[in-house]
């Protein structure tokens, strides 16, 4: 019996040792394998936040000046581009350019007349805004035709679209500025002069032109931009100082990108909404703002982008320059590429409408 117990104990010990041997092999430290790189959990669609910037913008007190930039602000498009706007009101384009030259503002809006200063090198166009129809030549009670302007006192604002429409109107009937008594006045003073009868006629843009037509008894619209649409064009643009366009390119591309989105929204039949924003900013009644919606052909950002690609936009500025030369406001031809930043508009448009944006 003792021998049997000893044999059984020996067998148990053998199996126990075997089990320990298996356990040792299972827990042995394996040869280190090549380290796998950690999986990248970063969202490929996430972009580095844009550095916040504040842009000082000069505008005029009308729907046309504000329709796109105010929409871009109200709809959050400027915020998307990291931009905070500081808006300042000015009487006209030349005054806005002077403010830019002094450093008071970064970007400004101009009507047709002030484009001659861009062609002269004083400013560079960073975006086409729209094709205007807000300028008009208006006669008082005793002036009912363009021919009646001869010998009359006519108020206008020199260096602005007011001067352009007046020159076109006079030339269309064989007259020049020498055939009238031309009175260079501030736009608000022109309205007052028409109301008091101190001048016989005037050349103005909206909304002042609408005010004269509504409040001056016997007033007659003698001509507007559409009168000469087959031979001329009236453009409105956004501008900046040439040296800054080169040195601070990113700021202007970001601004134009947001502006194009504002144009897309506004031009898509959102006139009532835009008019409310304009009325609130200018502290005018809604109807006054809404009535200005017919002052232009409102271009979308996509239309401007496509127009640059096919040469249409360059053609607009070339025609405008031809009119400057023929009217004596520009001495000689200047390549439009010298003062229109097509590349800024193209880069902004590429991000919104180009192949990369479609992917």
Where are these regions (language model features)?
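Short, glycine-/small- and polar/acidic-enriched structural segments
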Residues: 29-186, 193, 200-206, 221-222, ...
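Short amphipathic alpha-helical segments at helix boundaries and their inter-helical linkers
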Residues: 105-107, 196, 200, 296-313, ...
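Bacterial lipoprotein signal-peptidase II cleavage site
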Residues: 18-30
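Positively charged n-region of N-terminal signal peptides that target proteins for export
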Residues: 1-9
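Secondary-structure end/capping motifs
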Residues: 246-331
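Pocket-lining segment of extracytoplasmic ligand-binding domains
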Residues: 106, 112-113, 183, 189-282
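Conserved C-terminal helix/tail region of periplasmic/extracytoplasmic solute-binding proteins
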Residues: 317-359
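Hydrophobic core
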Residues: 9, 13-17
């Amino acid at each position: 019996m003792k021998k049997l117990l000893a044999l059984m104990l020996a067998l148990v010990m053998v199996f126990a040792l075997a089990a320990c041997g298996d356990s040792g092999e299972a827990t042995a430290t394996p040869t280190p394998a090549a380290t796998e790189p950690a999986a990248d959990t970063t969202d490929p669609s996430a972009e580095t936040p844009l550095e916040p910037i504040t842009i000082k913008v000069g505008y005029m007190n009308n729907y046309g000046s504000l329709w796109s930039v105010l929409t871009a602000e109200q709809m959050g498009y400027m915020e998307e581009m990291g931009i905070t706007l500081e808006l300042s009101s000015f009487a006209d384009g030349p005054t806005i350019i002077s403010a830019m030259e002094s450093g008071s503002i970064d970007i400004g809006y101009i009507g047709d007349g002030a484009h001659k200063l861009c062609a002269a090198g004083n400013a560079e166009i960073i975006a086409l805004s729209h094709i205007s129809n807000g300028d008009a030549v208006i006669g008082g009670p005793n002036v009912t035709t363009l021919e009646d302007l001869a010998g009359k006192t006519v108020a206008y604002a020199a260096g602005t679209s007011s001067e352009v429409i007046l020159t076109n109107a006079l030339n269309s009937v064989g007259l020049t500025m020498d055939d009238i008594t031309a009175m260079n006045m501030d736009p608000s003073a022109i309205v007052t002069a028409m109301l008091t009868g101190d001048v016989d006629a005037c050349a103005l843009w909206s909304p002042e032109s609408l005010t004269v037509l509504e409040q001056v008894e016997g007033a007659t619209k003698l001509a507007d931009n559409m009168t000469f649409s087959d031979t001329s064009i009236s453009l409105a643009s956004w501008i900046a100082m040439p040296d800054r366009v080169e040195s601070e390119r990113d700021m202007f591309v970001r601004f134009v990108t947001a502006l194009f989105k504002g144009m897309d929204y506004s031009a898509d039949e959102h006139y009532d909404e835009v008019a409310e924003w304009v009325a609130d900013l200018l502290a005018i009644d809604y109807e006054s703002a809404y009535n200005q919606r017919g002052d232009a052909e409102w271009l979308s950002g996509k239309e401007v982008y496509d127009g640059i690609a096919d040469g249409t936009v360059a053609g607009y500025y070339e025609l405008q320059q031809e009119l400057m030369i023929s009217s004596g406001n520009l001495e000689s031809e200047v390549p439009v590429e010298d003062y229109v930043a097509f590349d800024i508009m193209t880069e902004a448009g590429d991000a919104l409408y180009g192949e990369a944006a479609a992917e």
